[in-house]
Amino acid sequence: LAPKAMPSSLDKSIEPLSLSESIETLKDHLIENPEDFSTWKMLGMAQVAIGNLDDSIDSFENAFEINPDDIDLLLQYSSAIAANQEGQFLGKPQDLIEKALAIDPQSIQVLYFAGIVAAHQADLDLAKEYWQKALYLMPDSHPDRSVIEEALETILNLQVK
């Protein structure tokens, strides 16, 4: 059997969806599947990517109502709210990070964010503790290691002054 030529309708390249088109596709999916946690979370991340923080916060809130214990969601959600509050992690972002810390006190990402919250509250000793623990848990080759090392160095320099 020799393979036949592909029909001309399948021969054309499929153009990837733009981020805006993807967002609309996700929204359409959620109309039929409003309890789809993963899609709400993905929609929130896509909305952050295009700078639509208010809508992303709403999407993350919907995901949170479905699964309030997903650590990645808690961090994404807190980051979106903080970005909407000019980088401030006080209030709800802090509550979400504290919840994530209670769920997984060994998570490097959670420890990093907990350090940010502590630093925003001028609790430099606590920020240092969180970041040192994150570094201890993190492999030397981890690509984000330098970010935490720089944050820790900043704290140490502030404590010396």
Where are these regions (language model features)?
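Register position in tetratricopeptide repeats
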Residues: A49, A83-E86, H120, T154-L158
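The canonical alpha-helical register within tetratricopeptide repeats
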Residues: T25-D28, N62, K99, K133
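Alpha-helical adaptor scaffolds
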Residues: P7-K12, F37, M42-A49, D54-D104
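Soluble extracytoplasmic domains of inner/organellar membrane proteins
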Residues: A100, D104-A122, L126-A134
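Terminal, low-structured helical/coil segments at or just beyond the last alpha-helical repeat
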Residues: L126-K161
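Long, contiguous interaction/recruitment modules in multidomain scaffold/adaptor proteins
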Residues: L1-T25
